[in-house]
Amino acid sequence: MTTQHSPGLFRRLAHGSLVKQILAGLILGILLAWISKPAAEAVGLLGTLFVGALKAVAPILVLMLVMASIANHQHGQKTNIRPILFLYLLGTFSAALAAVIFSFAFPSTLHLSSSAGDISPPSGIVEVMRGLVMSMVSNPIDALLKGNYIGILVWAIGLGFALRHGNETTKNLVNDMSNAVTFMVKLVIHFAPIGIFGLVSSTLATTGFSTLWGYAQLLVVLVGCMLLVALVVNPLLVWWKIRRNPFPLVLLCLRESGVYAFFTRSSAANIPVNMALCEKLNLDRDTYSVSIPLGATINMAGAAITITVLTLAAVNTLGIPVDLPTALLLSVVASLCACGASGVAGGSLLLIPLACNMFGISNDIAMQVVAVGFIIGVLQDSCETALNSSTDVLFTAAACQAEDDRLANSALRN
Protein backbone atom coordinates (compact mmCIF):
# COMPACT_ATOMS: atom_id res chain seq x y z
CA MET A 1 0.00 0.00 0.00
CA THR A 2 1.45 3.33 -1.06
CA THR A 3 0.73 6.68 0.46
CA GLN A 4 0.93 9.93 -1.43
CA HIS A 5 2.46 12.87 0.33
CA SER A 6 1.65 16.44 -0.58
CA PRO A 7 4.70 18.34 -1.81
CA GLY A 8 6.51 20.16 0.95
CA LEU A 9 7.60 23.75 1.02
CA PHE A 10 11.11 22.96 -0.24
CA ARG A 11 9.79 20.95 -3.20
CA ARG A 12 7.33 23.69 -4.12
CA LEU A 13 10.11 26.28 -4.04
CA ALA A 14 12.48 24.07 -6.06
CA HIS A 15 9.91 23.65 -8.82
CA GLY A 16 8.34 27.09 -8.51
CA SER A 17 9.01 30.32 -10.35
CA LEU A 18 12.38 32.04 -10.25
CA VAL A 19 10.77 35.04 -8.58
CA LYS A 20 9.69 32.93 -5.61
CA GLN A 21 13.10 31.27 -5.42
CA ILE A 22 14.90 34.63 -5.42
CA LEU A 23 12.53 35.93 -2.76
CA ALA A 24 13.23 32.82 -0.67
CA GLY A 25 17.00 33.30 -1.10
CA LEU A 26 16.63 36.93 -0.06
CA ILE A 27 14.70 36.03 3.10
CA LEU A 28 17.04 33.15 4.02
CA GLY A 29 20.07 35.41 3.52
CA ILE A 30 18.60 38.00 5.89
CA LEU A 31 17.81 35.32 8.48
CA LEU A 32 21.29 33.77 8.31
CA ALA A 33 22.97 37.16 8.72
CA TRP A 34 20.76 37.85 11.72
CA ILE A 35 21.39 34.42 13.33
CA SER A 36 25.10 33.83 12.63
CA LYS A 37 27.49 36.42 11.28
CA PRO A 38 30.42 33.96 10.71
CA ALA A 39 28.19 31.56 8.77
CA ALA A 40 26.83 34.44 6.71
CA GLU A 41 30.34 35.57 5.81
CA ALA A 42 31.27 31.98 4.86
CA VAL A 43 28.40 31.55 2.37
CA GLY A 44 29.54 34.75 0.67
CA LEU A 45 31.50 32.43 -1.62
CA LEU A 46 28.20 31.51 -3.30
CA GLY A 47 27.64 35.14 -4.20
CA THR A 48 31.21 35.50 -5.43
CA LEU A 49 30.78 32.48 -7.73
CA PHE A 50 27.51 33.86 -9.08
CA VAL A 51 29.03 37.26 -9.88
CA GLY A 52 32.01 35.51 -11.49
CA ALA A 53 29.69 33.50 -13.73
CA LEU A 54 27.93 36.70 -14.79
CA LYS A 55 31.26 38.33 -15.61
CA ALA A 56 32.23 35.33 -17.73
CA VAL A 57 29.05 35.11 -19.80
CA ALA A 58 28.10 38.79 -20.28
CA PRO A 59 30.66 39.83 -22.97
CA ILE A 60 30.03 36.86 -25.29
CA LEU A 61 26.29 37.30 -24.74
CA VAL A 62 26.34 40.88 -26.07
CA LEU A 63 28.51 39.89 -29.05
CA MET A 64 26.38 36.95 -30.18
CA LEU A 65 22.96 38.52 -29.59
CA VAL A 66 23.67 41.72 -31.52
CA MET A 67 25.53 39.94 -34.32
CA ALA A 68 22.75 37.36 -34.80
CA SER A 69 20.01 39.98 -34.68
CA ILE A 70 21.58 42.10 -37.45
CA ALA A 71 22.69 39.16 -39.60
CA ASN A 72 19.21 37.57 -39.61
CA HIS A 73 17.26 40.78 -40.28
CA GLN A 74 14.53 40.15 -42.86
CA HIS A 75 14.43 42.45 -45.89
CA GLY A 76 11.35 43.51 -47.81
CA GLN A 77 8.90 44.01 -44.95
CA LYS A 78 7.09 47.24 -45.83
CA THR A 79 4.70 48.44 -43.16
CA ASN A 80 3.73 51.83 -41.83
CA ILE A 81 5.83 51.58 -38.67
CA ARG A 82 8.06 54.66 -38.96
CA PRO A 83 5.93 56.76 -36.56
CA ILE A 84 5.82 53.84 -34.12
CA LEU A 85 9.56 53.29 -34.37
CA PHE A 86 10.10 56.99 -33.70
CA LEU A 87 7.86 56.78 -30.63
CA TYR A 88 9.76 53.71 -29.42
CA LEU A 89 13.12 55.48 -29.66
CA LEU A 90 11.82 58.78 -28.29
CA GLY A 91 10.07 57.00 -25.42
CA THR A 92 13.19 55.04 -24.48
CA PHE A 93 15.36 58.16 -24.54
CA SER A 94 12.75 60.13 -22.56
CA ALA A 95 12.71 57.37 -19.94
CA ALA A 96 16.50 57.47 -19.63
CA LEU A 97 16.41 61.27 -19.34
CA ALA A 98 13.69 61.07 -16.68
CA ALA A 99 15.82 58.54 -14.79
CA VAL A 100 18.77 60.95 -14.84
CA ILE A 101 16.61 63.75 -13.42
CA PHE A 102 15.08 61.42 -10.83
CA SER A 103 18.52 60.16 -9.78
CA PHE A 104 19.82 63.70 -9.33
CA ALA A 105 16.72 64.66 -7.33
CA PHE A 106 16.87 61.52 -5.14
CA PRO A 107 20.50 60.28 -5.17
CA SER A 108 21.06 56.68 -4.09
CA THR A 109 24.20 54.87 -3.00
CA LEU A 110 25.23 51.22 -3.01
CA HIS A 111 27.40 49.10 -0.72
CA LEU A 112 30.38 48.05 -2.84
CA SER A 113 33.54 46.33 -1.68
CA SER A 114 35.85 48.39 -3.90
CA SER A 115 36.81 51.95 -3.07
CA ALA A 116 36.94 55.02 -5.28
CA GLY A 117 40.69 54.70 -5.40
CA ASP A 118 40.34 51.71 -7.72
CA ILE A 119 39.08 53.89 -10.59
CA SER A 120 40.19 56.89 -12.62
CA PRO A 121 37.10 59.05 -13.16
CA PRO A 122 36.89 61.20 -16.31
CA SER A 123 37.30 64.94 -15.89
CA GLY A 124 34.48 65.92 -18.24
CA ILE A 125 32.57 65.28 -21.43
CA VAL A 126 35.66 65.60 -23.67
CA GLU A 127 37.51 62.86 -21.82
CA VAL A 128 34.37 60.71 -21.79
CA MET A 129 34.01 61.09 -25.57
CA ARG A 130 37.69 60.30 -26.09
CA GLY A 131 37.34 57.18 -23.97
CA LEU A 132 34.26 56.10 -25.91
CA VAL A 133 36.00 56.55 -29.26
CA MET A 134 39.11 54.66 -28.12
CA SER A 135 36.93 51.86 -26.77
CA MET A 136 35.29 51.52 -30.18
CA VAL A 137 38.56 50.64 -31.92
CA SER A 138 39.66 48.05 -29.39
CA ASN A 139 40.86 44.62 -30.49
CA PRO A 140 37.82 42.27 -30.35
CA ILE A 141 39.59 39.60 -28.30
CA ASP A 142 40.91 42.24 -25.92
CA ALA A 143 37.41 43.75 -25.67
CA LEU A 144 35.96 40.35 -24.73
CA LEU A 145 38.68 39.64 -22.18
CA LYS A 146 38.46 43.06 -20.50
CA GLY A 147 34.69 43.46 -20.71
CA ASN A 148 34.89 46.48 -23.06
CA TYR A 149 31.24 46.42 -24.07
CA ILE A 150 31.45 49.42 -26.39
CA GLY A 151 34.14 47.71 -28.43
CA ILE A 152 32.12 44.49 -28.35
CA LEU A 153 29.07 46.33 -29.70
CA VAL A 154 31.06 47.88 -32.56
CA TRP A 155 32.46 44.52 -33.63
CA ALA A 156 29.08 42.81 -33.25
CA ILE A 157 27.35 45.43 -35.42
CA GLY A 158 30.09 45.31 -38.05
CA LEU A 159 30.14 41.52 -38.22
CA GLY A 160 26.34 41.42 -38.26
CA PHE A 161 26.13 43.68 -41.32
CA ALA A 162 28.91 41.73 -43.04
CA LEU A 163 27.12 38.42 -42.39
CA ARG A 164 23.95 39.74 -44.03
CA HIS A 165 25.66 38.93 -47.33
CA GLY A 166 26.57 35.41 -46.18
CA ASN A 167 24.66 32.26 -47.07
CA GLU A 168 21.75 30.96 -45.01
CA THR A 169 23.86 28.19 -43.47
CA THR A 170 26.22 30.76 -41.96
CA LYS A 171 23.32 32.88 -40.69
CA ASN A 172 21.71 29.81 -39.13
CA LEU A 173 25.01 28.93 -37.44
CA VAL A 174 25.27 32.44 -35.95
CA ASN A 175 21.66 32.23 -34.79
CA ASP A 176 22.28 28.80 -33.23
CA MET A 177 25.36 30.15 -31.44
CA SER A 178 23.28 33.04 -30.13
CA ASN A 179 20.66 30.59 -28.84
CA ALA A 180 23.39 28.50 -27.21
CA VAL A 181 24.83 31.52 -25.39
CA THR A 182 21.32 32.54 -24.34
CA PHE A 183 20.86 29.04 -22.91
CA MET A 184 24.05 29.44 -20.90
CA VAL A 185 22.81 32.78 -19.58
CA LYS A 186 19.52 31.20 -18.52
CA LEU A 187 21.50 28.46 -16.80
CA VAL A 188 23.47 31.06 -14.84
CA ILE A 189 20.29 32.97 -14.01
CA HIS A 190 18.78 29.78 -12.55
CA PHE A 191 21.48 29.94 -9.87
CA ALA A 192 20.46 33.50 -8.99
CA PRO A 193 18.59 32.45 -5.80
CA ILE A 194 21.72 30.73 -4.44
CA GLY A 195 23.94 33.61 -5.48
CA ILE A 196 21.60 36.17 -3.95
CA PHE A 197 21.44 34.12 -0.76
CA GLY A 198 25.23 34.36 -0.50
CA LEU A 199 25.36 38.02 -1.51
CA VAL A 200 22.68 39.12 0.95
CA SER A 201 24.13 37.06 3.79
CA SER A 202 27.70 38.29 3.38
CA THR A 203 26.65 41.89 2.69
CA LEU A 204 24.50 42.12 5.81
CA ALA A 205 27.14 40.35 7.89
CA THR A 206 29.83 42.82 6.87
CA THR A 207 27.85 46.08 6.57
CA GLY A 208 24.86 45.50 8.84
CA PHE A 209 21.12 45.54 8.29
CA SER A 210 21.20 49.22 7.38
CA THR A 211 22.12 48.03 3.87
CA LEU A 212 18.49 47.05 3.38
CA TRP A 213 17.44 50.66 3.66
CA GLY A 214 19.86 51.57 0.87
CA TYR A 215 18.29 48.94 -1.37
CA ALA A 216 14.80 50.06 -0.34
CA GLN A 217 15.63 53.63 -1.32
CA LEU A 218 17.05 52.41 -4.63
CA LEU A 219 13.85 50.45 -5.28
CA VAL A 220 11.73 53.50 -4.50
CA VAL A 221 13.75 55.55 -7.00
CA LEU A 222 13.52 52.84 -9.68
CA VAL A 223 9.81 52.10 -9.30
CA GLY A 224 8.97 55.78 -8.78
CA CYS A 225 10.74 56.70 -12.01
CA MET A 226 8.91 53.93 -13.89
CA LEU A 227 5.59 55.21 -12.55
CA LEU A 228 6.56 58.72 -13.64
CA VAL A 229 7.23 57.50 -17.17
CA ALA A 230 4.07 55.37 -17.30
CA LEU A 231 1.72 58.04 -15.94
CA VAL A 232 3.34 61.32 -17.05
CA VAL A 233 5.93 60.95 -19.84
CA ASN A 234 4.09 58.35 -21.93
CA PRO A 235 0.73 60.19 -21.72
CA LEU A 236 2.47 63.37 -22.91
CA LEU A 237 3.92 61.52 -25.91
CA VAL A 238 0.53 59.96 -26.70
CA TRP A 239 -1.22 63.34 -26.40
CA TRP A 240 1.36 64.85 -28.75
CA LYS A 241 0.44 62.12 -31.26
CA ILE A 242 -3.37 61.94 -30.98
CA ARG A 243 -4.16 65.42 -29.60
CA ARG A 244 -6.80 64.26 -27.12
CA ASN A 245 -7.04 62.87 -23.60
CA PRO A 246 -4.46 60.05 -23.52
CA PHE A 247 -5.34 58.53 -20.14
CA PRO A 248 -8.17 56.18 -21.23
CA LEU A 249 -5.74 54.53 -23.65
CA VAL A 250 -2.83 54.64 -21.18
CA LEU A 251 -4.83 53.05 -18.36
CA LEU A 252 -6.31 50.43 -20.70
CA CYS A 253 -2.84 49.35 -21.84
CA LEU A 254 -1.52 49.25 -18.26
CA ARG A 255 -4.50 47.21 -17.12
CA GLU A 256 -4.72 44.68 -19.98
CA SER A 257 -1.03 44.43 -20.92
CA GLY A 258 1.05 45.79 -18.05
CA VAL A 259 -0.54 43.71 -15.30
CA TYR A 260 -0.02 40.47 -17.24
CA ALA A 261 3.58 41.39 -18.11
CA PHE A 262 4.24 42.20 -14.44
CA PHE A 263 3.73 38.55 -13.53
CA THR A 264 5.23 36.89 -16.64
CA ARG A 265 8.33 39.13 -16.54
CA SER A 266 8.79 38.51 -20.27
CA SER A 267 8.07 40.92 -23.11
CA ALA A 268 8.23 38.01 -25.55
CA ALA A 269 5.64 36.03 -23.59
CA ASN A 270 3.38 39.09 -23.56
CA ILE A 271 3.34 39.47 -27.36
CA PRO A 272 0.12 37.41 -27.80
CA VAL A 273 -1.57 39.51 -25.10
CA ASN A 274 -0.59 42.71 -26.88
CA MET A 275 -1.73 41.30 -30.23
CA ALA A 276 -5.14 40.49 -28.78
CA LEU A 277 -5.42 43.99 -27.29
CA CYS A 278 -4.53 45.55 -30.66
CA GLU A 279 -7.27 43.49 -32.30
CA LYS A 280 -9.70 44.61 -29.59
CA LEU A 281 -8.79 48.23 -30.37
CA ASN A 282 -9.40 47.59 -34.12
CA LEU A 283 -5.88 48.62 -35.10
CA ASP A 284 -4.35 47.90 -38.50
CA ARG A 285 -3.26 44.26 -38.51
CA ASP A 286 -0.41 44.76 -40.97
CA THR A 287 1.00 47.42 -38.66
CA TYR A 288 0.69 45.82 -35.24
CA SER A 289 1.78 42.38 -36.47
CA VAL A 290 5.19 43.99 -37.07
CA SER A 291 5.29 46.75 -34.44
CA ILE A 292 4.46 44.56 -31.43
CA PRO A 293 7.30 42.03 -31.95
CA LEU A 294 9.59 44.94 -32.87
CA GLY A 295 8.62 46.73 -29.67
CA ALA A 296 9.44 43.63 -27.64
CA THR A 297 12.96 43.95 -29.05
CA ILE A 298 13.81 47.66 -29.05
CA ASN A 299 11.19 49.49 -26.96
CA MET A 300 12.88 49.28 -23.58
CA ALA A 301 11.96 52.30 -21.46
CA GLY A 302 12.08 50.25 -18.27
CA ALA A 303 15.50 48.86 -19.12
CA ALA A 304 16.79 52.38 -19.84
CA ILE A 305 15.59 53.47 -16.40
CA THR A 306 17.23 50.49 -14.69
CA ILE A 307 20.56 51.02 -16.45
CA THR A 308 20.57 54.77 -15.75
CA VAL A 309 19.51 54.64 -12.09
CA LEU A 310 21.90 51.83 -11.12
CA THR A 311 24.79 53.40 -13.02
CA LEU A 312 24.27 56.77 -11.34
CA ALA A 313 23.91 55.02 -7.98
CA ALA A 314 27.35 53.47 -8.54
CA VAL A 315 28.70 56.87 -9.60
CA ASN A 316 27.32 58.49 -6.44
CA THR A 317 28.76 55.71 -4.29
CA LEU A 318 32.24 56.19 -5.75
CA GLY A 319 32.05 59.99 -5.50
CA ILE A 320 32.48 60.64 -9.23
CA PRO A 321 31.30 64.12 -10.27
CA VAL A 322 28.85 64.19 -13.20
CA ASP A 323 28.28 67.32 -15.27
CA LEU A 324 25.17 68.00 -17.38
CA PRO A 325 26.66 67.05 -20.80
CA THR A 326 27.89 63.74 -19.37
CA ALA A 327 24.45 63.07 -17.88
CA LEU A 328 22.85 63.72 -21.28
CA LEU A 329 25.36 61.38 -22.92
CA LEU A 330 24.48 58.75 -20.32
CA SER A 331 20.83 59.05 -21.41
CA VAL A 332 21.84 58.28 -24.99
CA VAL A 333 24.12 55.38 -23.99
CA ALA A 334 21.46 53.94 -21.67
CA SER A 335 18.92 54.11 -24.50
CA LEU A 336 21.26 52.23 -26.82
CA CYS A 337 22.04 49.69 -24.10
CA ALA A 338 18.34 49.17 -23.44
CA CYS A 339 17.71 48.27 -27.08
CA GLY A 340 20.10 45.34 -26.63
CA ALA A 341 18.43 44.01 -23.51
CA SER A 342 15.53 42.17 -25.14
CA GLY A 343 14.84 38.48 -24.83
CA VAL A 344 17.33 37.87 -22.01
CA ALA A 345 16.47 37.27 -18.38
CA GLY A 346 18.08 40.13 -16.50
CA GLY A 347 19.26 41.61 -19.79
CA SER A 348 19.14 45.22 -18.64
CA LEU A 349 21.26 44.34 -15.60
CA LEU A 350 23.88 42.60 -17.71
CA LEU A 351 24.26 45.73 -19.85
CA ILE A 352 24.95 48.04 -16.89
CA PRO A 353 28.75 47.59 -17.28
CA LEU A 354 28.55 49.25 -20.70
CA ALA A 355 27.15 52.43 -19.14
CA CYS A 356 29.60 52.16 -16.23
CA ASN A 357 32.49 52.18 -18.71
CA MET A 358 31.69 55.84 -19.41
CA PHE A 359 32.80 56.83 -15.92
CA GLY A 360 35.94 54.70 -15.74
CA ILE A 361 34.27 52.16 -13.45
CA SER A 362 35.99 48.78 -13.69
CA ASN A 363 34.19 45.62 -14.76
CA ASP A 364 34.61 44.16 -11.25
CA ILE A 365 32.74 47.05 -9.64
CA ALA A 366 30.16 47.12 -12.43
CA MET A 367 29.35 43.46 -11.82
CA GLN A 368 28.82 44.22 -8.13
CA VAL A 369 26.22 46.75 -9.30
CA VAL A 370 24.65 44.00 -11.43
CA ALA A 371 24.51 41.78 -8.35
CA VAL A 372 22.68 44.54 -6.46
CA GLY A 373 20.24 44.63 -9.36
CA PHE A 374 19.55 40.94 -8.92
CA ILE A 375 18.89 41.44 -5.21
CA ILE A 376 16.16 43.99 -5.95
CA GLY A 377 15.17 42.25 -9.18
CA VAL A 378 12.11 40.53 -7.73
CA LEU A 379 10.22 43.81 -8.00
CA GLN A 380 12.44 45.75 -10.40
CA ASP A 381 12.26 43.22 -13.24
CA SER A 382 8.48 42.86 -12.96
CA CYS A 383 7.93 46.64 -13.05
CA GLU A 384 10.42 47.01 -15.89
CA THR A 385 8.70 44.37 -18.03
CA ALA A 386 5.26 45.82 -17.30
CA LEU A 387 6.40 49.26 -18.49
CA ASN A 388 8.21 47.88 -21.54
CA SER A 389 5.40 45.67 -22.79
CA SER A 390 2.47 47.99 -22.09
CA THR A 391 4.30 50.78 -23.91
CA ASP A 392 4.58 48.57 -27.02
CA VAL A 393 0.81 48.43 -27.47
CA LEU A 394 0.33 52.02 -26.23
CA PHE A 395 2.58 53.58 -28.88
CA THR A 396 1.23 51.26 -31.58
CA ALA A 397 -2.33 52.31 -30.76
CA ALA A 398 -1.37 56.00 -30.61
CA ALA A 399 0.30 55.94 -34.03
CA CYS A 400 -2.54 53.96 -35.62
CA GLN A 401 -5.20 56.25 -34.16
CA ALA A 402 -3.28 59.33 -35.29
CA GLU A 403 -3.11 57.91 -38.82
CA ASP A 404 -6.85 57.12 -38.78
CA ASP A 405 -7.58 60.68 -37.66
CA ARG A 406 -5.40 62.08 -40.44
CA LEU A 407 -7.17 60.00 -43.08
CA ALA A 408 -10.58 60.97 -41.69
CA ASN A 409 -9.69 64.67 -41.78
CA SER A 410 -8.39 64.33 -45.34
CA ALA A 411 -11.65 62.67 -46.39
CA LEU A 412 -13.68 65.49 -44.84
CA ARG A 413 -11.66 68.12 -46.70
CA ASN A 414 -12.25 66.32 -49.98
From Swiss-Prot:
It comes from the Bacteria. It catalyses: L-serine(in) + Na(+)(in) = L-serine(out) + Na(+)(out); L-threonine(in) + Na(+)(in) = L-threonine(out) + Na(+)(out). This is Serine/threonine transporter SstT. Involved in the import of serine and threonine into the cell, with the concomitant import of sodium (symport system). Disulfide bonds: none annotated. Residues 37-45, 105-142, 201-217, 321-331 are periplasmic. The chain crosses the membrane at residues 16-36, 46-66, 84-104, 143-163, 180-200, 218-238, 300-320, 332-352. The keyword Transport applies. One of its GO terms (biological process) is serine transport. Residues 2-15, 67-83, 164-179, 239-299, 353-414 are cytoplasmic. InterPro entries: Na-dicarboxylate_symporter (IPR001991), Na:dicarbo_symporter_sf (IPR036458), Ser_Thr_transp_SstT (IPR023025). It is found in: Cell inner membrane. HAMAP family: Ser_Thr_transp_SstT. Keywords: Amino-acid transport, Cell inner membrane, Cell membrane, Membrane, Symport, Transmembrane, Transmembrane helix, Transport. NCBIfam families: PRK13628.1. Belongs to the dicarboxylate/amino acid:cation symporter (DAACS) (TC 2.A.23) family. Its main location: membrane. The gene is sstT. GO terms for cellular component: plasma membrane. One of its GO terms (molecular function) is neutral L-amino acid:sodium symporter activity. The lineage of its organism: Bacteria, Pseudomonadati, Pseudomonadota, Gammaproteobacteria, Enterobacterales. It is a multi-pass membrane protein.
